[in-house]
Amino acid sequence: MLAQKDAERGILEDDKKIHMRETVESLSADIAHEHWLASKEARELTTTSAAKLPILNTEQLAPTWRSAEPLLVIGARTELDQAAAAIFAALVEMHGVPARVECAEMLTACNIANLDLSGVALMCVSSVDMKTPAHIHFAARRLRSRAPHAKLLLGLWSAKDDETGAELKDVVGTDDFARTFHQAAAIILQRATTDQGGAKAPARASAALA
């Protein structure tokens, strides 16, 4: 993505990156609102790939997915990662799974203990581009330590092929990998209806994971 490359080269100033994130987040909110306003018939007639995914109701969700916000989507590193996280969370909510978005700062050793993971069944780390898996590897370890009961999904939205993604999934240590919003949403909706087991309280953060 051009914006991601500009950010890496330092062309995008901090205020511009923040404005971009806010704009994208606002757009995602508008998309969610328009979807809610649309009639059931209109949704059934649409031919987009997202519309081919099921729209779940609460009764269809597995017990561990019936909390207020069973899905956590968190930006991996940059403002663009967070903006992508906001759009993806809005998409999944359109299909009946409540989601919460957090910023990348919550993945740091200093902040991970303050990340509320109660009721979370799946954590999705959103990354527009990942030159090295080291950063997300440590983030995954911290998330695993806090919520060992929850599944972990890596959304690497710029991956060119599934083979690369599968390799990164193994290196990073996530349960699932997706390189498109549609793939990731399909994984989440499938887990949301089939996951078994009781909800558990998140563990306390360990200093060893700093």
Each predicted region: which residue ranges?
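Peripheral docking tails and interdomain loops at the edges
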Residues: H149-A210
